């Protein structure tokens, strides 16, 4: 029964599920001839959450659809990343195999599949971070970017490596199961190389020490993370996160690695003359794909960490044609973004081919790659975007070579004013 008379004649209402009266619970919600209390609602929600977590664990990915194939992953990367065809292919296969492995966890088998973390080697602005971000968005898994240069050994001033896992948890609302299937991108991994091949009596707290700390995280460990972003202190309960199934992608420019590779392969001599240097710079894209573990060890990475990054993809330096394509082709191309911003003011933006060429050349001159394109376009449009809200009648903004190369002002095209009747 959902209701009956009390001793005072008051009509008492009861939960149809647990039988508690309206005085024993905070809230009683009525339905067609039934009632349910807030405690039973909480219990139902908990059961649903637990079942969803189990189902997600068995299914592997935190996505509803099936795992995309390497071809589908590559096609998605093509929409956002221009060029770097071989790197995209390597990444597509590695990521597909990683999440395929997770989908089959727990199944009894004689063969245990190892995790294949990834090392991306390429110059600044070649698309390393964008590739990792696009992969995480496609797979709908938690993603975090960490800067290796801010990391230090535990106990020293700086970020502890376990802070990376804390940020990953924050990005998925502290759902541990989701975090344990996420992607971590560690940028500037080359900046924590050993300072020399010989052990030093002084502590290398931001070099080899950090590599050793990262090694545990990358190969798989139980990381202790303070709940909800609190600071670590004794007598505190920690969240335990197993990093065994987190995919780690490490990226770096590795400036000078090509010299080490060429020394090993004896294809060319190493010198300090300008001619030799220009030759080396010209051949970097051809030399980097020949990288071997021994080259990375000589560069300053510890052998154990290299062993935990078995998949190596190299990215080429972007040329003028690639940078021009990046400006206009991808889904979220920079030119499309600024066209949308100006369209909100009712103004059309046109960047002529000569303007695109000038932007690409300036980025190459600055040695910033694709990363520098936005700042060049932003600088060219700064005054226009400042004045436009108060500037009536502008129909189109045009950027050409002179706007970029000579720091000239963009051309403003105004709407034709309607002629007043009777005027000459």
From Swiss-Prot:
What Gene Ontology molecular-function terms does this entry list? ATP binding; ATP hydrolysis activity; ATP-dependent protein folding chaperone; protein dimerization activity; unfolded protein binding; zinc ion binding
Q: Which SMART domains does the record associate with it?
A: AAA, ClpB_D2-small, zf-C4_ClpX
Domain of life of the source: Bacteria
* Domain ClpX-type ZB residue range list: 3-56
Which InterPro entries does the record cross-reference, listed alphabetically? AAA+_ATPase, ATP-dep_Clp_protease_ClpX, ATPase_AAA_core, Clp_ATPase_C, Clp_protease_ATP-bd_su_ClpX, ClpX_bact, P-loop_NTPase, Znf_CppX_C4
A Pfam family this chain is assigned to = AAA_2
Residues that bind ATP = 123-130
Recorded GO cellular component terms are: HslUV protease complex
Matching entries from PANTHER family are given as:
ATP-DEPENDENT CLP PROTEASE ATP-BINDING SUBUNIT CLPX-LIKE, MITOCHONDRIAL, ATP-DEPENDENT CLP PROTEASE ATP-BINDING SUBUNIT CLPX-LIKE, MITOCHONDRIAL-RELATED
**What is the name listed in the Swiss-Prot or TrEMBL entry for this protein?**
ATP-dependent Clp protease ATP-binding subunit ClpX
């Amino acid at each position: 029964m959902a209701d009956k008379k009390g001793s005072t004649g008051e009509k008492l209402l009861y939960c149809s599920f647990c039988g508690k009266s309206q005085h024993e619970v905070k809230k009683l919600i009525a339905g067609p001839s039934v009632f349910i209390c807030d405690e039973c609602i909480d219990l139902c929600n908990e059961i649903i959450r637990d079942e969803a977590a189990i189902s997600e664990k068995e299914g592997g990915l935190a996505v509803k659809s099936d795992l995309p194939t390497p071809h589908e992953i590559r096609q998605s990367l093509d929409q956002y990343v221009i060029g770097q065809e071989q790197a995209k292919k390597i990444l597509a296969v590695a990521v597909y195999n990683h999440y395929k492995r997770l989908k089959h966890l727990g199944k009894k088998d004689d063969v245990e599949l190892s995790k294949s973390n990834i090392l991306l080697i390429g110059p600044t602005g070649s698309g390393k971070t964008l590739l990792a971000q696009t992969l995480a968005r496609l797979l709908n898994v938690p993603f975090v970017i960490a800067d290796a240069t801010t990391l230090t050994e535990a106990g020293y001033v700086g970020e502890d490596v376990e802070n990376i896992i804390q940020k990953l948890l924050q990005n998925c609302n502290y759902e541990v199961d989701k975090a344990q299937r996420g992607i971590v991108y560690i940028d500037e991994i080359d900046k924590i190389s050993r300072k020399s091949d010989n052990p030093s009596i002084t502590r290398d707290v931001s070099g080899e020490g950090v590599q050793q700390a990262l090694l545990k995280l990358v190969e798989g460990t139980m990381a202790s993370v303070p709940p909800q972003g609190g600071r670590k202190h004794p007598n505190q309960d920690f969240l335990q996160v197993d990093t065994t199934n987190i995919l780690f992608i490490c990226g770096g420019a590795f400036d000078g690695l090509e010299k080490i590779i060429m020394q090993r392969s004896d294809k060319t001599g190493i010198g300090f003359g300008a001619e030799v240097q220009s030759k080396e710079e010209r051949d970097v894209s051809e030399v980097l794909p020949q990288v071997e573990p021994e080259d990375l060890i000589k560069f300053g990475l510890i052998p154990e960490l290299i062993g935990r990054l078995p998949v190596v993809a190299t990215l080429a330096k972007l040329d003028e044609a690639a940078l021009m394509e990046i400006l206009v082709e991808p889904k979220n191309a920079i030119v499309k973004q600024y066209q949308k911003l100006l369209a909100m003011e009712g103004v059309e933006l046109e960047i002529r081919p000569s303007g695109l060429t000038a932007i690409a050349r300036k980025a190459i001159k600055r040695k910033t790659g694709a990363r520098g394109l936005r700042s060049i376009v932003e600088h060219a449009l700064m005054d226009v975007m400042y004045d436009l809200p108060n500037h009536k009648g502008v129909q189109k903004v045009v950027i050409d070579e002179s706007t970029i190369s000579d720091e000239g002002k963009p051309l403003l095209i105004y709407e034709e004013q309607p002629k007043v009747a009777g005027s000459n």
